[in-house]
Amino acid sequence: MTDSDHRLPDRPGEGDPGRGRRIGIDVGCVRVGVATSDPDGVLATPVETVRREKSSDRHVRRLAQLVTELEAVEVVVGLPRTLADRTGPAAHDAIDVAEALARRIAPVPVRMADERLTTVSAQRSLREAGVRAKGQRAMIDQVAAVGILQSWLDQRRAALAAPGEGGHG
């Protein structure tokens, strides 16, 4: 059993690096969705979808490049825990990508955020917006990354506004 068997999501606001862009990442089997925030951490927007390479770390290199290009102060990777709050294969995969990315971008912190049902929510949003199923595949990972990051930003703002909570703000 590894540490990742019991990996729980991080809490927004703890060890907060202060003002600056954040990057949200949705790790999938085939693609990785990427989103970013404005420097004030108010709004998440899609950036790109990175093709996943199981046989190489090309996707991790691209993610690290985006962190540098966007001058991110924090990275938030979705942790897809099961509905029973367990760590399944998808969560182990996300943790592996997060750890590989953290090694490349240190000292920029990489956090894990609870992302149960974000892909389902993203699919529903795209369907309601009239995007056909074929078109959804190209966008779904970015929309899920936006959902992960926006949730983190909202929770961070609330944590930093609470008395005695958070970091620099």
From Swiss-Prot:
Renumbered residue ranges of the record's region Disordered: 1-22
Protein name: Putative pre-16S rRNA nuclease
MF-aspect GO terms: nuclease activity
GO CC annotations on file: cytosol
Family according to the record: Belongs to the YqgF nuclease family.
Biased composition (Basic and acidic residues): 1-19
GO biological process, one term: rRNA 5'-end processing
Localization per Swiss-Prot or TrEMBL: Cytoplasm
Protein's job: Could be a nuclease involved in processing of the 5'-end of pre-16S rRNA.
Enzyme nomenclature, EC number: 3.1.-.-
Keyword Secreted assigned: no
Main location: cytoplasm
Heme recorded as keyword: no
Keywords associated with the record: Cytoplasm, Hydrolase, Nuclease, Ribosome biogenesis
Organism the protein comes from: Mycobacterium sp. (strain JLS)
